[in-house]
């Protein structure tokens, strides 16, 4: 009897918070500023917004790649697409990027922060110089972009989307300053969300926590920083056997993106004109994605979350 009662209460609890009512038409004509749009997840997000008819301003460090993405977005039907090449390591770049977007689009409905800056593994990555650079690109620039765009997002009752990493939730070897920057993102935007709620500012904040990518460059960087075998045994089980439970054989030369099951608890419903936070349903296991070509459905589901006021992860 107790089991049935608890099951019923749990079902009511999730039914109260779960509201999957995404309307693709809500993104038609939306004004979107997307960073890190030259490749990977950022590139796929740009294409998804383009298909849905959003007005786009794309930014990244590499202008040639940006031009290619802009051309593809126009072919996919984006009414307006602009780009600005910017190096987020420069303290002046974030404000100029937001100002460019405001001038071109007349305001913002979505600010999607997706850019990253990597670093060499090992002791070099822990140097003050590397840490300062990484914090500027992966954290401080996010704060600067948000601060400059927040007045426009407040006027439009828009959404702020932060693409983060599992390394911002779980400390990992050979990623010291990078992990610190991602932890800082979680703390800053988690606190900002509560501040906006207290001030009755109707801007939704979405934290997207992505898993690890299996890349040859990352493996080589780690191998150069330790003398340990590549596949050490843990409790008698080879590491290769452990990871095989989560990562199936990948497409040759493909990059793997594995989602994390870290989702956390739902937030209470708001009394404002629209609900500010919900949680994505979690199936309780890791779901690997191999190659960007077959990753598109996953990115589309991510984009659905970007159009809704979800908060992925715990606070």
Curated annotation (Swiss-Prot):
Q: Where is the signal peptide?
A: 1-15
InterPro entries reported for this sequence: 11-beta-HSD, NAD(P)-bd_dom_sf, Sc_DH/Rdtase_CS, SDR_fam
Q: Which reaction does it catalyse?
A: cortisone + NADPH + H(+) = cortisol + NADP(+)
Tissue expression, as annotated, is: Highly expressed in the brain.
Instruction: Using the UniProt annotation, give all residue ranges assigned to the region (Disordered).
Output: 221-286
Q: What is this enzyme's EC?
A: 1.1.1.-
Binding-site positions, substrate: 165
Mention any one GO cellular component term assigned to this protein in its UniProt record.
intracellular membrane-bounded organelle
Keyword flag NADP: yes
| PROSITE patterns in UniProt | ADH_SHORT (PS00061)
Quote the biased-composition stretches of kind Basic and acidic residues, using this chain's numbering.
277-286
Q: Which UniProt keywords apply?
A: NADP, Oxidoreductase, Secreted, Signal
Classify the main location.
Answer: secreted
Sections of the chain in a coiled coil: none
Q: Which Gene3D superfamilies match?
A: NAD(P)-binding Rossmann-like Domain
List the molecular function annotations (GO) for this entry.
Answer: oxidoreductase activity
Q: Which family does it belong to?
A: Belongs to the short-chain dehydrogenases/reductases (SDR) family.
Protein name in UniProt: Hydroxysteroid 11-beta-dehydrogenase 1-like protein
| Lineage, uppermost ranks | Eukaryota, Metazoa, Chordata, Craniata, Vertebrata
Q: Which gene encodes it?
A: HSD11B1L
């Amino acid at each position: 009897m107790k089991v049935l009662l608890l099951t019923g209460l749990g079902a009511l609890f999730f039914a109260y918070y779960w509201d999957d009512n995404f309307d693709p038409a809500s993104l038609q004509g939306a004004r979107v500023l997307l960073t890190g749009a030259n490749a990977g997840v950022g590139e796929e997000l740009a294409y998804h917004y383009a298909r849905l008819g959003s007005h786009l301003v794309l930014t990244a460090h590499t202008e040639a790649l940006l031009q290619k993405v802009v051309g593809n977005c126009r072919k996919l039907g984006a009414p307006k697409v602009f780009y600005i090449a910017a190096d987020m390591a420069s303290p002046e770049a974030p404000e100029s990027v937001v100002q460019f977007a405001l001038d071109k689009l007349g305001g913002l409905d979505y600010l999607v922060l997706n850019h990253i800056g990597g670093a060499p593994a090992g002791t070099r990555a822990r140097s003050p110089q590397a840490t300062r650079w990484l914090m500027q690109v992966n954290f401080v620039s996010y704060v600067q972009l948000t601060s400059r765009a927040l007045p426009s997002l407040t006027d439009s009752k828009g959404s702020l989307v932060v693409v983060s990493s599992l390394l911002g939730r779980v400390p990992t070897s050979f990623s010291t300053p990078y992990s610190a920057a991602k932890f800082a993102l979680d703390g800053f935007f988690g606190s900002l969300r509560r501040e906006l709620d207290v001030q009755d500012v109707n801007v939704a904040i979405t934290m997207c926590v992505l898993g690890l990518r299996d890349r040859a460059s990352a493996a080589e960087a780690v191998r150069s920083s330790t003398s340990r075998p590549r596949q050490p045994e843990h409790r008698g089980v080879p590491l290769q056997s452990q990871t095989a439970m989560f990562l199936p054989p990948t497409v040759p030369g493909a990059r793997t993106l594995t989602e994390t099951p870290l989702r956390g608890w739902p937030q209470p419903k708001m009394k404002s004109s629209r609900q500010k936070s919900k949680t994505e349903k979690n199936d309780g296991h890791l779901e690997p994605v191999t190659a960007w070509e077959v990753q598109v459905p996953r990115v589309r589901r991510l984009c659905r979350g970007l159009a809704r006021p979800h908060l992925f992860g715990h606070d």
